């Protein structure tokens, strides 16, 4: 009995010492790192966070500590940037220092620092330069990709017409369409909409994004070193990631067998050719692992973000039928009903442009951006960030900055219209991030959003099974990604 009592006292004493040391270390660095709540050993600020609403939970600290503060997500120390000014100062004014890539534990399980999106240093530089050039070679930013999107829009319209106005879940109708655009670039061809393997891949991607946006997904972000060895939903997420990697490996093997060095058919071919050209370069980053991970980067990013934005957009238009009516009026006046929309039409369609921008602003699909990391010891404002410090630029806080958007919690296309009804840009429109590690697929995504939205709205009216006042447009999850609520709808021919 005495021994157990002494053991308990010893444990309490050790815990007290650890807490006091944590407080001392925090105060010692206060003159350097931004301020923030005092962390506990290992668990950090976990007890002060609501993992169901992690973004809002993190943002609340700004009320006490200001727009730049430090939190501890378990053992991870992260500097958080809130609001337009802080985010722009870091990502644009000090772009080079803040251009490192931070941790994204779920995706890091498969990427492990390889591939264009999650790499750092010379690897990131080489792969990014190649990816941008290769996408351009396959038509991105040119008329070629616009024709590809228009063709895919036609397939989408046919698929929707085949529902004959029935109540449907639009999720996979939209993700099939969007994914086929990037698939035509990275794999050289589109998938049939009924292809079972294709539908399985889309389901895997959706499942991964949904996991990262759950409470368990956020726990994994904090305690991945422990949780990756334990049973739980994270193991299912790993299986989904492995399934996607296996699919990419199969595609790469096929291209290796059929490769014509003089006639690349897709992104994989182009990378394989570059691997051959660089095989004697000891510093090359062009090898099989980076090929597979870069291809997987493009496939996932080119599918989920745009399709989620479309899904959120149709829900918002059903919630606001007066906006849908104005969209229809502008389409009929500028394009009519007898020709396909073109990307250049957007210059004559300020209201449609404003609606799409407001959908992106309100939807806020990647609210915390991908984590950044400072590449060297960095002075930021009055603070000192040691080399390697992780940084969360809270894009959602910029998209809802009241200095730029009146009533930022409301969906209102007027946020992007001037007094004359003309489209107006905003420095706080940052859904693709800004600076050196912004989304290099931004141009493709903008074109897809305009052409897909406009083509669907040209052909259909949207009908919900609920009255507009009963439609809930609050997100299902807001963590790594913003996931809209599940819903069904009807597309009625116009």
UniProtKB/Swiss-Prot annotation:
Q: Where in the cell is it found?
A: Endoplasmic reticulum membrane; Microsome membrane
Q: Binding positions for heme?
A: 439
**What keywords sit in the KW lines?**
Endoplasmic reticulum, Heme, Iron, Membrane, Metal-binding, Microsome, Monooxygenase, Oxidoreductase
User: Which molecular function GO terms apply here?
Assistant: arachidonate epoxygenase activity; heme binding; iron ion binding; oxidoreductase activity, acting on paired donors, with incorporation or reduction of molecular oxygen, reduced flavin or flavoprotein as one donor, and incorporation of one atom of oxygen; oxygen binding
Q: How does this chain sit within the bilayer?
A: Peripheral membrane protein
* Coiled coil (UniProt feature): none
Q: Which domain of life is it from?
A: Eukaryota
Q: Which cofactors, if any, are listed as required?
A: heme
Cross-referenced Pfam families = p450 (PF00067)
Gene Ontology cellular-component terms for this entry are: cytoplasm; endoplasmic reticulum membrane; intracellular membrane-bounded organelle
Q: Which reaction does it catalyse?
A: an organic molecule + reduced [NADPH--hemoprotein reductase] + O2 = an alcohol + oxidized [NADPH--hemoprotein reductase] + H2O + H(+)
> Could you tell me the EC number(s) of this protein?
1.14.14.1
Cited CDD domains? CYP2A
Induction field: P450 can be induced to high levels in liver and other tissues by various foreign compounds, including drugs, pesticides, and carcinogens.
Q: Does the keyword Aminoacyl-tRNA synthetase apply?
A: no
A GO BP entry: xenobiotic metabolic process
Q: Which family does it belong to?
A: Belongs to the cytochrome P450 family.
Kindly provide the name given to this protein in its UniProt entry.
Answer: Cytochrome P450 2A7
Q: Which organism is it from?
A: Homo sapiens (Human)
The gene designation is CYP2A7
């Amino acid at each position: 009995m005495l021994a157990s009592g002494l053991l308990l006292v010893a444990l309490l004493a050790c815990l007290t010492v650890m807490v006091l040391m944590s407080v001392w270390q925090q105060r010692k660095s206060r003159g350097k790192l931004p301020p923030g709540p005092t962390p506990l050993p290992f668990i950090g600020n976990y007890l002060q966070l609501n993992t169901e609403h992690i973004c809002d939970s993190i943002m609340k600290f700004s009320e006490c500590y200001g727009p730049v503060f430090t939190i501890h997500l378990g053992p991870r120390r992260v500097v958080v940037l809130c609001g337009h000014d802080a985010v722009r100062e870091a990502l644009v004014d000090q772009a080079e220092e803040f251009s490192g890539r931070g941790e994204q534990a779920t995706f890091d399980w498969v990427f492990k620092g390889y591939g264009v999106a999650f790499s750092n240093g010379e690897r990131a530089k080489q792969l990014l330069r190649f990816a941008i050039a290769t996408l351009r070679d396959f038509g991105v930013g040119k008329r070629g990709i616009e024709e590809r999107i228009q063709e895919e829009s036609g397939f989408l319209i046919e698929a929707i017409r085949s529902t004959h106005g029935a109540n449907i879940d639009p999720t996979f109708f939209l993700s099939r369409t969007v994914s086929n655009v990037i698939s035509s670039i990275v794999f050289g061809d589109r998938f049939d909409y009924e292809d079972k393997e294709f539908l399985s891949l889309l389901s895997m991607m959706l499942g991964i994004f949904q996991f990262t946006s759950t409470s368990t997904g956020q726990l994994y972000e904090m305690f991945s070193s422990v949780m990756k060895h334990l049973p739980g939903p994270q193991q299912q997420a790993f299986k989904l990631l492995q399934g996607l990697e296996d699919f990419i490996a199969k595609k790469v093997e096929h291209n290796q067998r059929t490769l014509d060095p003089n006639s690349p058919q897709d992104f994989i071919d182009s990378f394989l050719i570059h691997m051959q050209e660089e095989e004697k370069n000891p510093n090359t980053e062009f090898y099989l692992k980076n090929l597979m991970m870069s291809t997987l980067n493009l496939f996932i990013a080119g599918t989920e973000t745009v399709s989620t934005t479309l899904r959120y957009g149709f829900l918002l238009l059903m919630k606001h039928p007066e906006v849908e009516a104005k969209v229809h009026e502008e389409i009929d006046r500028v394009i009519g009903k007898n020709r396909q929309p073109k990307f250049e039409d957007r210059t004559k369609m300020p209201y449609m442009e404003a609606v799409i921008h407001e959908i992106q602003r309100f939807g806020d699909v990647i609210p915390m951006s991908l984590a950044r990391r400072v590449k060297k010891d960095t002075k930021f404002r009055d603070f000192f960030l040691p080399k390697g410090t992780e940084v969360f630029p809270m894009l959602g806080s910029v998209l809802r900055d009241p200095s730029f958007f009146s009533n930022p919690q409301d969906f209102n296309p007027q946020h992007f219209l001037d007094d004359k009804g003309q489209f107006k840009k905003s420095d706080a429109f940052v859904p693709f991030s800004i600076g050196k590690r912004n989304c290099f697929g931004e141009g493709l995504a903008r074109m897809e959003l305009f052409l897909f939205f406009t083509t669907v709205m040209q052909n259909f009216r949207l009908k919900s099974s609920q009255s507009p006042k009963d439609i809930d447009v609050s997100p299902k999850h807001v963590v790594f990604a913003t996931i809209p609520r599940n819903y069904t709808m009807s597309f009625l021919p116009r």
